[in-house]
Protein backbone atom coordinates (compact mmCIF):
# COMPACT_ATOMS: atom_id res chain seq x y z
CA UNK A 1 0.00 0.00 0.00
CA UNK A 2 2.84 2.40 0.85
CA UNK A 3 4.49 1.73 -2.51
CA UNK A 4 1.22 2.45 -4.32
CA UNK A 5 0.65 5.71 -2.45
CA UNK A 6 4.20 6.86 -3.16
CA UNK A 7 3.63 6.25 -6.89
CA UNK A 8 0.54 8.46 -6.97
CA UNK A 9 0.60 12.09 -8.02
CA UNK A 10 -1.22 13.10 -4.84
CA UNK A 11 -1.75 11.06 -1.63
CA UNK A 12 -5.53 11.59 -1.77
CA UNK A 13 -5.45 10.05 -5.23
CA UNK A 14 -5.66 6.64 -3.58
CA UNK A 15 -9.27 7.36 -2.68
CA UNK A 16 -10.18 9.80 -5.45
CA UNK A 17 -8.63 8.25 -8.56
CA UNK A 18 -8.50 4.82 -6.95
CA UNK A 19 -12.22 5.04 -6.27
CA UNK A 20 -12.87 6.10 -9.86
CA UNK A 21 -10.82 3.18 -11.23
CA UNK A 22 -12.56 0.73 -8.90
CA UNK A 23 -15.96 2.10 -9.84
CA UNK A 24 -15.24 1.99 -13.57
CA UNK A 25 -13.92 -1.57 -13.38
CA UNK A 26 -16.50 -3.04 -11.00
CA UNK A 27 -19.29 -1.06 -12.64
CA UNK A 28 -18.31 -2.45 -16.02
CA UNK A 29 -18.22 -6.03 -14.73
CA UNK A 30 -21.49 -5.80 -12.77
CA UNK A 31 -23.22 -3.79 -15.47
CA UNK A 32 -22.22 -6.22 -18.19
CA UNK A 33 -23.22 -9.23 -16.07
CA UNK A 34 -26.60 -7.63 -15.37
CA UNK A 35 -27.39 -7.52 -19.08
CA UNK A 36 -27.79 -11.32 -18.97
CA UNK A 37 -30.43 -11.16 -16.22
CA UNK A 38 -34.01 -12.12 -17.01
CA UNK A 39 -35.49 -9.08 -15.24
CA UNK A 40 -36.03 -6.05 -17.47
CA UNK A 41 -35.61 -3.80 -14.43
CA UNK A 42 -32.17 -5.29 -13.76
CA UNK A 43 -31.37 -4.97 -17.48
CA UNK A 44 -32.27 -1.27 -17.47
CA UNK A 45 -30.28 -0.54 -14.31
CA UNK A 46 -27.31 -2.54 -15.62
CA UNK A 47 -27.36 -0.67 -18.93
CA UNK A 48 -27.15 2.66 -17.09
CA UNK A 49 -24.41 1.36 -14.78
CA UNK A 50 -22.43 0.06 -17.75
CA UNK A 51 -22.81 3.36 -19.61
CA UNK A 52 -21.70 5.36 -16.58
CA UNK A 53 -18.72 3.12 -15.81
CA UNK A 54 -17.51 3.40 -19.43
CA UNK A 55 -17.90 7.18 -19.21
CA UNK A 56 -15.75 7.29 -16.06
CA UNK A 57 -13.17 5.06 -17.78
CA UNK A 58 -13.04 7.50 -20.71
CA UNK A 59 -12.43 10.45 -18.39
CA UNK A 60 -9.72 8.50 -16.58
CA UNK A 61 -7.88 8.23 -19.92
CA UNK A 62 -7.94 12.03 -20.00
CA UNK A 63 -6.52 12.23 -16.47
CA UNK A 64 -3.81 9.72 -17.33
CA UNK A 65 -2.96 11.67 -20.48
CA UNK A 66 -2.24 14.70 -18.32
CA UNK A 67 -0.20 12.53 -15.89
CA UNK A 68 -2.57 13.40 -13.06
CA UNK A 69 -2.97 9.93 -11.55
CA UNK A 70 0.61 8.71 -11.13
CA UNK A 71 3.94 10.52 -10.93
CA UNK A 72 5.51 8.51 -13.75
CA UNK A 73 4.26 8.73 -17.33
CA UNK A 74 4.60 4.98 -17.88
CA UNK A 75 2.26 4.23 -14.98
CA UNK A 76 -0.31 6.70 -16.30
CA UNK A 77 0.06 5.15 -19.76
CA UNK A 78 -0.53 1.64 -18.41
CA UNK A 79 -3.72 2.71 -16.64
CA UNK A 80 -4.84 4.73 -19.65
CA UNK A 81 -4.42 1.74 -21.95
CA UNK A 82 -6.40 -0.47 -19.55
CA UNK A 83 -9.24 2.05 -19.39
CA UNK A 84 -9.29 2.29 -23.19
CA UNK A 85 -10.31 -1.37 -23.31
CA UNK A 86 -13.25 -0.67 -21.02
CA UNK A 87 -14.61 2.25 -23.04
CA UNK A 88 -13.90 0.82 -26.50
CA UNK A 89 -11.06 3.16 -27.44
CA UNK A 90 -8.32 0.53 -27.72
CA UNK A 91 -8.39 0.25 -31.52
CA UNK A 92 -5.92 3.11 -31.77
CA UNK A 93 -2.98 3.65 -29.43
CA UNK A 94 -2.96 5.54 -26.15
CA UNK A 95 -0.01 7.57 -27.46
CA UNK A 96 -2.06 8.73 -30.47
CA UNK A 97 -4.91 9.85 -28.24
CA UNK A 98 -2.51 11.70 -25.96
CA UNK A 99 -0.70 13.40 -28.87
CA UNK A 100 -3.95 14.61 -30.43
CA UNK A 101 -5.21 15.91 -27.10
CA UNK A 102 -2.03 17.82 -26.35
CA UNK A 103 -2.02 19.33 -29.82
CA UNK A 104 -5.45 20.65 -28.91
CA UNK A 105 -4.08 22.25 -25.73
CA UNK A 106 -0.80 23.56 -27.14
CA UNK A 107 -2.24 24.85 -30.43
CA UNK A 108 -5.49 26.22 -28.95
CA UNK A 109 -7.19 24.40 -31.79
CA UNK A 110 -9.36 21.40 -32.60
CA UNK A 111 -6.78 19.33 -34.48
CA UNK A 112 -8.27 16.51 -36.56
CA UNK A 113 -7.52 14.23 -39.52
CA UNK A 114 -11.04 13.76 -40.89
CA UNK A 115 -12.53 16.67 -42.87
CA UNK A 116 -16.09 15.86 -41.81
CA UNK A 117 -17.74 19.04 -43.14
CA UNK A 118 -16.29 18.33 -46.56
CA UNK A 119 -17.27 14.65 -46.28
CA UNK A 120 -20.89 15.42 -45.42
CA UNK A 121 -21.02 18.02 -48.17
CA UNK A 122 -20.08 15.35 -50.72
CA UNK A 123 -22.57 12.81 -49.35
CA UNK A 124 -25.95 14.57 -48.94
CA UNK A 125 -27.94 11.32 -48.64
CA UNK A 126 -25.74 10.13 -45.78
CA UNK A 127 -26.00 13.57 -44.19
CA UNK A 128 -29.80 13.38 -44.23
CA UNK A 129 -29.63 9.87 -42.75
CA UNK A 130 -27.34 11.11 -39.96
CA UNK A 131 -29.69 13.99 -39.17
CA UNK A 132 -32.67 11.63 -39.17
CA UNK A 133 -30.99 9.22 -36.75
CA UNK A 134 -29.82 12.06 -34.51
CA UNK A 135 -33.45 13.14 -34.11
CA UNK A 136 -34.00 9.78 -32.39
CA UNK A 137 -30.94 10.29 -30.16
CA UNK A 138 -28.86 7.78 -32.08
CA UNK A 139 -25.38 9.40 -32.16
CA UNK A 140 -24.84 8.68 -35.85
CA UNK A 141 -22.22 11.41 -36.28
CA UNK A 142 -20.11 9.95 -33.48
CA UNK A 143 -20.65 6.42 -34.75
CA UNK A 144 -19.04 7.46 -38.04
CA UNK A 145 -16.07 8.82 -36.09
CA UNK A 146 -15.96 5.60 -34.08
CA UNK A 147 -15.98 3.56 -37.30
CA UNK A 148 -12.89 5.47 -38.46
CA UNK A 149 -11.20 4.75 -35.14
CA UNK A 150 -12.09 1.04 -35.25
CA UNK A 151 -10.52 0.64 -38.70
CA UNK A 152 -7.89 3.32 -38.14
CA UNK A 153 -4.98 1.45 -39.77
CA UNK A 154 -7.05 0.77 -42.90
CA UNK A 155 -8.43 4.30 -43.27
CA UNK A 156 -5.68 6.63 -42.04
CA UNK A 157 -2.49 6.16 -44.12
CA UNK A 158 -0.22 7.41 -41.32
CA UNK A 159 -1.38 4.55 -39.10
CA UNK A 160 -0.74 1.64 -41.45
CA UNK A 161 2.16 0.54 -39.26
CA UNK A 162 -0.44 -0.24 -36.55
CA UNK A 163 -2.21 -2.80 -38.76
CA UNK A 164 -1.29 -5.90 -36.74
CA UNK A 165 -2.34 -4.36 -33.45
CA UNK A 166 -5.48 -2.87 -34.97
CA UNK A 167 -6.57 -6.20 -36.47
CA UNK A 168 -5.90 -8.00 -33.17
CA UNK A 169 -8.15 -5.62 -31.25
CA UNK A 170 -10.86 -5.85 -33.94
CA UNK A 171 -10.79 -9.66 -33.79
CA UNK A 172 -11.00 -9.71 -29.99
CA UNK A 173 -13.68 -7.07 -29.47
CA UNK A 174 -15.52 -7.78 -32.70
CA UNK A 175 -15.43 -11.52 -32.08
CA UNK A 176 -16.91 -11.17 -28.59
CA UNK A 177 -19.63 -8.83 -29.85
CA UNK A 178 -20.47 -11.21 -32.71
CA UNK A 179 -20.83 -14.09 -30.25
CA UNK A 180 -23.15 -11.96 -28.14
CA UNK A 181 -25.16 -11.00 -31.20
CA UNK A 182 -25.62 -14.65 -32.19
CA UNK A 183 -26.17 -16.29 -28.80
CA UNK A 184 -27.34 -13.39 -26.60
CA UNK A 185 -28.87 -10.77 -28.92
CA UNK A 186 -30.55 -8.92 -26.05
CA UNK A 187 -27.17 -8.43 -24.36
CA UNK A 188 -25.62 -7.16 -27.60
CA UNK A 189 -28.43 -4.62 -28.08
CA UNK A 190 -28.26 -3.41 -24.47
CA UNK A 191 -24.47 -3.07 -24.69
CA UNK A 192 -24.89 -0.98 -27.85
CA UNK A 193 -27.41 1.22 -26.04
CA UNK A 194 -25.02 1.64 -23.10
CA UNK A 195 -22.22 2.57 -25.50
CA UNK A 196 -24.36 5.17 -27.24
CA UNK A 197 -25.37 6.63 -23.88
CA UNK A 198 -21.67 7.05 -23.09
CA UNK A 199 -21.21 8.79 -26.45
CA UNK A 200 -24.04 11.20 -25.65
CA UNK A 201 -22.53 12.14 -22.29
CA UNK A 202 -19.01 12.59 -23.66
CA UNK A 203 -20.01 14.73 -26.61
CA UNK A 204 -22.40 16.85 -24.53
CA UNK A 205 -19.64 17.60 -22.03
CA UNK A 206 -17.07 18.18 -24.78
CA UNK A 207 -19.46 20.55 -26.52
CA UNK A 208 -19.46 22.74 -23.41
CA UNK A 209 -15.68 22.70 -22.91
CA UNK A 210 -14.42 24.30 -26.13
CA UNK A 211 -15.81 25.62 -29.39
CA UNK A 212 -12.59 25.91 -31.36
CA UNK A 213 -12.99 25.62 -35.14
CA UNK A 214 -11.29 22.48 -36.42
CA UNK A 215 -8.23 22.16 -38.64
CA UNK A 216 -7.16 18.96 -40.42
CA UNK A 217 -3.51 19.30 -39.45
CA UNK A 218 -3.07 16.25 -37.24
CA UNK A 219 -0.38 14.75 -39.48
CA UNK A 220 0.58 17.82 -41.51
CA UNK A 221 1.80 20.30 -38.94
CA UNK A 222 1.28 23.95 -39.73
CA UNK A 223 1.93 26.89 -37.46
CA UNK A 224 -1.34 27.26 -35.53
CA UNK A 225 -2.69 30.81 -35.85
CA UNK A 226 -3.72 31.06 -32.19
CA UNK A 227 -0.93 29.18 -30.41
CA UNK A 228 -0.25 30.93 -27.10
CA UNK A 229 -3.17 33.30 -27.62
CA UNK A 230 -4.66 33.49 -24.12
CA UNK A 231 -7.50 35.77 -25.21
CA UNK A 232 -8.55 33.32 -27.95
CA UNK A 233 -8.37 30.43 -25.50
CA UNK A 234 -10.59 32.19 -22.97
CA UNK A 235 -13.09 33.17 -25.64
CA UNK A 236 -13.48 29.54 -26.70
CA UNK A 237 -13.17 27.75 -23.35
CA UNK A 238 -16.02 27.18 -20.93
CA UNK A 239 -15.12 25.60 -17.59
CA UNK A 240 -17.74 23.74 -15.61
CA UNK A 241 -18.76 25.85 -12.59
CA UNK A 242 -18.77 24.09 -9.25
CA UNK A 243 -21.77 26.20 -8.30
CA UNK A 244 -23.24 29.65 -8.95
CA UNK A 245 -21.69 30.83 -5.69
CA UNK A 246 -18.24 29.36 -6.43
CA UNK A 247 -17.83 29.50 -10.24
Where are these regions (language model features)?
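Short acidic-hydrophobic sequence patches enriched in Asp/Glu that either
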Residues: 71-78, 93-96, 196-200
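Cytosolic-biased juxtamembrane loops and peripheral soluble domains of multi-pass membrane proteins
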Residues: 62-78, 100-126, 149-161, 204-245
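Aromatic-lined glycan-binding groove of carbohydrate-active enzymes
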Residues: 187, 191-215
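Non-catalytic, topology-defining segments of multipass membrane proteins
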Residues: 1-53, 60, 87-192
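Alpha-helical transmembrane segments and their membrane-interface exit regions
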Residues: 49-57, 196-203
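Short cytosolic helices in intracellular loops of multi-pass membrane proteins
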Residues: 80-84
